[in-house]
Amino acid sequence: MEVTPLINLDNHQTPLFWCPLPDFLLRRITEGLFHDLCKGKNQLGIEFGNEYGRAFERYVGRILYEVFDLDRFAITGEQPYKVSGQIRHGVDGIVSDATGNIFIECKTRRMKQGAKETAEGETLEKSLDELAVAVVQLYKNIDDATNGLSEWIPNGRPIYPFVITYEDWYLFTPQVVNQLNECVQHRLEAAQLPRALTETMPFFVTSIGEFEMAGQDIAHLGIERFCAAGVISEYRHFQLSVLVQKAFPNETIVHRHLLKNSWGEIFPKMQEWAGMAGMKEGW
């Protein structure tokens, strides 16, 4: 129903449609256009599904440069490298400071609706295993980097793996998180990597919406201080932006709206409309 939110229950096929979940209809005509784009190709024959992923990676990159002060943080994008003659693309991004490193994998894949509605079952297991593929790919890239196979130069500081997703995966129950960890450990074993990586180098899963806020917290606190608190928190996989409120209640961090110039280009009248509504900001 995410793809076809309008249904016709009439056997005589009269032009009468029902919309059981109006929210699905709204999403279908906005972000749901992805379902149409991913099936097509551009004039060069490149599938839009792949381009969609690339566009998301570029967006995450823009957020990194918007959030992190380059006087204190170093930001590195994707840097392909060769291993035994084969090209590997490596991580999608790395953010480093004097205390630690964040290795980033971007994923547009979403949790299927059926998986969101249950805490068990085949649909959920399949979705979690798809996410586990991304997590293990990130661990593989980190393994290459720490062994000197990539362009990144190891600095001896702790590494925190971050999978940044387009949508939230709602990983807020211990049961679901445990299932995800099991999927990751099975795939780590298949990739001949230590299962214990989930304990020695715990991974984060966060949506880009959450990261836009949490990234500002990281920029304020520093990588190691924020992430060390995060690895022992229930917010490591869900609502990462709430972590600071719970772990650092005495810290005052003023969050700002990001990419204001882009918003102004897309919605040139937004500030005027916001003024009419008595709002300080148009977004």
Ranges and model annotations:
Residues 1-66, 178-283:
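Interfaces and regulatory segments of ATP-dependent nucleotide/adenylate/phosphodiester-chemistry enzymes
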Residues 67-96:
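A short acidic/basic microdomain associated with nuclease active sites
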Residues 95-116:
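Active-site beta-strand-loop-beta-strand hairpin of nuclease catalytic cores
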Residues 111-131:
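A solvent-exposed, charged loop/short amphipathic helix patch at secondary-structure junctions
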Residues 118-122, 175-183:
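Short secondary-structure boundary/capping segments
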Residues 124-158:
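Acidic, metal/cofactor-coordinating or nucleic-acid-engaging core segments within structured domains
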Residues 159-166:
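Extended hydrophobic secondary-structure segments that form protein cores and membrane-embedded regions
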Residues 167-177:
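A short acidic (Asp/Glu
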